[in-house]
Amino acid sequence: MSLNHVPAGKSLPEDIYVVIEIPANADPIKYEVDKDSGAVFVDRFMSAPMFYPCNYGYVNNTLSLDGDPVDVLVPTPYPLMPGSVIRCRPVGVLKMTDESGEDAKVVAVPHSKISKEYEHIQDVGDIPELLKAQITHFFERYKELESGKWVKVDGWADVEAAKAEILQSYERAQNK
């Protein structure tokens, strides 16, 4: 099943579709979904014995400054299957830099039609402090044992920054 036809969202940038690549709390394996075939490929076994604190995926038809689609973290009560698509609402963004340049991670919560559990989270300040600390900790350390790779977390930004990241990346992909 090709994922090329999955739209970026229902109403950008407030209502997005996230293609999940890595389930929350899963084994330390980095998966990537092939957009043409829909197949889930093993990208690598992570050297650091860590797991993603949230489901991890991307917004289709977007192009971030690192040359990949917009990365998105989706907290949910249960891990999501790789290759699944979930309707979400962005609430913040973790600004980062790695060996390839800028590498922002949008945080988006499930749309209220999927779960009412996240309706109170409207902006980055509403995300539980422990979850933000876990996300920051993960990204500061998940590449530590990989030669030539590094990450610098630059900090958290609000919902407007997350929406801007999505819109700019969507426009970049359309103009490519």
Curated annotation (Swiss-Prot):
Its BP terms in the Gene Ontology are: phosphate-containing compound metabolic process
Highest taxon of the lineage? Bacteria
Pfam name, any one: Pyrophosphatase
Q: What GO cellular component is one of the record's annotations? A: cytoplasm
Positions contributing to Mg(2+) 1 binding: 66, 71, 103
Q: Which SUPFAM superfamilies match?
A: Inorganic pyrophosphatase
Q: Which residues bind substrate?
A: 30, 44, 56, 142
Sites where the protein binds Mg(2+) 2: 71
- Name the InterPro entries for this protein: Pyrophosphatase, Pyrophosphatase_sf
Reaction(s) this enzyme catalyzes, per UniProt:
diphosphate + H2O = 2 phosphate + H(+)
* Cofactor names: Mg(2+)
Q: Where in the cell is the protein located?
A: Cytoplasm
Q: Which keywords, in A-to-Z order, does the entry hold?
A: Cytoplasm, Hydrolase, Magnesium, Metal-binding
EC no. given is 3.6.1.1
Q: Name one GO molecular function term.
A: inorganic diphosphate phosphatase activity
Entry annotated with the keyword Lipid biosynthesis: no
Q: Which family does it belong to?
A: Belongs to the PPase family.
Q: What does this protein do?
A: Catalyzes the hydrolysis of inorganic pyrophosphate (PPi) forming two phosphate ions.
What's the protein name? Inorganic pyrophosphatase
Q: Which organism is it from?
A: Vibrio parahaemolyticus serotype O3:K6 (strain RIMD 2210633)
